[in-house]
């Protein structure tokens, strides 16, 4: 049976390679599965799996290179970032940012990968071409989120246990500020104008809005879905619509997605999604968003214009991150 599975997977991968070897924007959906040690590849029209890529142990965060020909995957328990060629769906290289890389980002020029090393309480800067660590900066306890500012000058790092965000100058590799936020800060985004940085605080149950000029927390956004206890509201994933008007926050154990007006900072709506809503990603046209549900091993698809759930499809065990080649 295992031989048959390998043969079928090879056929799928070969067909993908032949069809898309010179194409941009295949539409393929990639989902990292922490407990299956794999990346599920799905058809963008049917949401059916068409291939499974064996990865290193515990694949988590994923990021694209600039033209989306390569997908970088953090294999945390193997202490490496794997590079997947989209045309062939095969691993073609590695980057080694020291132990236990969980989240990472890549500078706009595609040269430097910046990763959080959760067990070592530091962040590593890696020259991608040379696969060489060029700087390591101490952080608070359990660094996680890594988000580069829109102008490419600064990187913001969340430190879960220390309850702070570190703001680091990328060119000089120097820490500019340490901003106290809520309990267990996790993921974040910048508004399109770069003036605000929004970060989820999982245990505190709110989002901190940080002014990127003053490095001060300027506002907090709380969530109160009807019928749920405060302790069940655990925001983790966060993203912003490509038009910059609406933010989407996954509320973890609340099994909800919150829709927040970016201008007013007011929650407009809650949608029921899967178990332990963990991450959220957009199609590039902003028409659909995808909520990764790590507790139910599936992904919820939402029509952004109608603000309603249109489908839920299964993936691997304990999905972490979803990326779309569009």
Indicate where each model-derived feature is located.
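Sec-dependent signal peptide recognition
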Residues: 1-9
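Predominantly soluble domains enriched in secretory-pathway, periplasmic, or organellar proteins
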Residues: 11-326
